[in-house]
Amino acid sequence: YVNYGCSTRKSLYQLVDFFSLFYFRFLRDSSFRNLLYWSKLQRTPRFYAWAGVSFEILAMNHIDQVKQRLGISGVSPQLYSWRSKSDAGAAERAAQIDMVIERGDNTINLCEMKFSESEFAINKDYEKILRNKIVRFMEETKTRKSIQLTFISSYGLQRNMYSGIAQNEVVLNDLF
């Protein structure tokens, strides 16, 4: 993926083949002698890390459906990834945007993608992280375009006092 605001030299490369991702995460170094291997693997940090990356790749592979759900199929969007240029003293301010959709109507969708087994709840701390991502993106890219936070998740957002930070929402069913 081309990094927003950078040349193609600074592109981000990601393994996007689902089987290879699964193989390198779980099969390459494992022993199948343990009959409970797969049962014990579920609900572990290792499993959730793999599921999160796989969900992001799934959403990126279904960008046409994402654009359709957002109602922007006809505004010639460009896709990017983005990572802040964090300096050594500002690690807490570092930010990464899973997918940036730059639209032809002077609007940018900053897409945050999350795998979860139920509705995803944004809490006070996570809202602060999301606001930091938006601010860092605007500061570092110096964009004057309108910014919309788009949340792409398995089952949608749980409505609460913090969920309003997302102007758009895409769920797993929208991808198929």
Q: Where are the regions that the model predicts?
A:
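Beta-hairpin "wing" of winged helix-turn-helix
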Residues: 1-3
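A cross-kingdom feature that marks ATP-driven nucleic-acid transaction machinery
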Residues: 5-176
